[in-house]
């Protein structure tokens, strides 16, 4: 009887342990109030699955800045796929996505939006923020090799999503028939193979009414493909108040075909 009671107690403990949500104790923003001059952790909000291939983070720092998110910043310029272990080592294979309204702005300073921490929710598996400049709520939830974005737009005839493949060699292609953007980035900080590329595929659930690509800061409407030092794309559509547009993003260091499988 005594052994039976001990077994019941042990099983009860196992069930309790499995049911407990330990993520409620995790604050991904902790340690992010850091800078080149002073570290309080040198972390960034890494929104990711355990052992995920990619992390996703809101980006407050400039392209190439190792301090890609700092708690004291007041503007977000994109939502970035990252593999960065520390600001000193920096990143590799990064690219970003950003919703904007009004004008199709690619420049990272001009597309940036004010935000406040009271409008921000950060957990290990989900991130949400209100972008005041554009009146857009952005949400993201990652899988092991992909991520799902949800953008809640205002009523606007000129709602856009910017895709920035970053500099140091990149490629982008808009595929309107498939509501899709594909591309690759070669940006890295060393320690990668000579043929290094991070291939990505982005699928939207809303047809495009506007399309443009960007080559080294030069926006070209109705041009759907660029291979250059710094490539990007902007797609757009009309939205009604509260309309939600979803974007599924997957990537691979092997090929576009593998990214589609991921």
Where are these regions (language model features)?
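Accessory carbohydrate-recognition regions in carbohydrate-active enzymes
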Residues: 20-262
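Bacterial Sec-dependent N-terminal signal peptides
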Residues: 1-20
């Amino acid at each position: 009887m005594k052994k039976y009671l001990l077994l019941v107690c042990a099983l009860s403990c196992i069930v309790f342990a499995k049911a407990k949500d330990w993520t409620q104790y995790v604050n991904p923003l902790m340690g992010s109030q850091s800078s080149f001059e002073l570290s309080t952790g040198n972390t960034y909000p890494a929104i990711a699955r355990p052992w995920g291939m990619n992390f996703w983070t809101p980006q407050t720092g400039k392209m190439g800045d190792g301090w890609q998110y700092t708690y004291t910043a007041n503007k977000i310029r994109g939502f970035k796929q990252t593999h960065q272990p520390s600001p000193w080592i920096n990143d590799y294979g990064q690219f970003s996505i950003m919703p904007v309204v009004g004008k199709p702005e690619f420049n990272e300073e001009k597309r940036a939006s004010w935000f406040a921490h009271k409008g921000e929710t950060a957990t290990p598996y989900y991130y949400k923020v209100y972008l005041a400049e554009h009146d857009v709520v952005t949400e993201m939830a990652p899988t092991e090799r992909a991520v799902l974005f949800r953008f809640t737009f205002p009523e606007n005839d000129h709602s856009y999503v910017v895709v920035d493949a970053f500099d140091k060699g990149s490629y982008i292609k808009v595929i309107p028939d498939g509501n899709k953007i594909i591309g690759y980035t070669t940006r890295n900080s060393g320690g990668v193979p000579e043929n290094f590329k991070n291939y990505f595929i982005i699928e939207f659930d809303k047809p495009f009414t506007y399309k443009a690509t960007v080559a080294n800061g030069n926006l070209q409407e109705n041009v759907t493909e660029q291979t250059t030092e710094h490539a990007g794309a902007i797609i757009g559509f009309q939205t009604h108040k509260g309309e939600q547009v979803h974007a599924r993003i997957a990537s691979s260091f092997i090929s576009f075909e593998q990214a589609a499988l991921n």
